[in-house]
């Protein structure tokens, strides 16, 4: 019998165990369980003491060792799997679509769960002959016909859509670019730490400004709460800032919140604060299709797809942008497409289960648009909805 272990099912599963001296992890032959549930302090030891001989880890890249331990939850997953892997008689099957994200250390930490000798310095070459028996790669084209069945992968159609910045938006963006150039150049004689923080603060502002007026507004508003920084001190690495700010296929989850880490120690002067406040006021007046050409172009594309009978999904980088786009699509297209429900689902909407519920509720609407961040890129088969 297969037992799906969830908090809501624990009581029923335990009632099905015939003896009190064994746990449900010993009794049920096959278990399906979330690693985040089983690694908790309450459940970890019970599972470790009765772990099965074969363990299959899905989405294994989310349990790789993190850079500097920044992602606490992911680091806990890795440490938990490492404990399980210590038993040489235990079999591990780890599946992932993104085993190597470009971060060699994270990739090797996964391999190290299979054989500790693989978890070496990234500069040291791996023995490919020794590695080969442990790794199986199957690309999409390799499994179009799989075990006698057609897999029917959807065709991927890519296209670029240009949009024009309104004069007001273009003026704000050019002024922000000028400010960023000046603030980075002004650190020419400063210490390495200050240069690095100022650089990442500038990139944060630019990314937010290009994402949406709402993201720019949120970025600049959050900046207000930041205190002046200090000169060279022990500081986060470039990777710590990059993981917040840049798009990534890293094994760690890409955060969808506005990246303000670099502002903590950016050390803005009073004149810079006044200048940023001016940008904030201008950003507040750019929402809507009249002055935001990007959301206008998005609405035109969504309008076309709705007219063709599709239920579009719009992905955004930041939470604030996703909420803004959903609001705008509802306002722009609601009258034309009767019964339209445009809804955002982001990393701010609870855990995986809560987000699945929200997506499921939206799928019941006959005319719908989902606006999401990358938190929905895994774990939910959006094509079913």
Locations of the language-model features?
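Conserved helix-turn-beta segment of the N-terminal RecA-like "Helicase ATP-binding" lobe
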Residues: 1-12, 114-117, 328-337
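Conserved nucleic-acid-binding Ia/Ib motif block in the N-terminal RecA-like helicase ATPase lobe
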Residues: 1-25, 29-30
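Conserved helicase motor
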Residues: 5-15, 35-40, 316-320, 340-356, ...
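Inter-lobe coupling linker of SF2 helicases/translocases
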Residues: 20, 27, 32-52, 64, ...
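Conserved catalytic network of the ASCE P-loop NTPase/AAA+ motor domain
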Residues: 23-25, 46-49, 84-89, 304-307, ...
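Walker B catalytic acidic pair
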Residues: 58-59
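Conserved Helicase C-terminal RecA-like lobe
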Residues: 154-164, 217-368
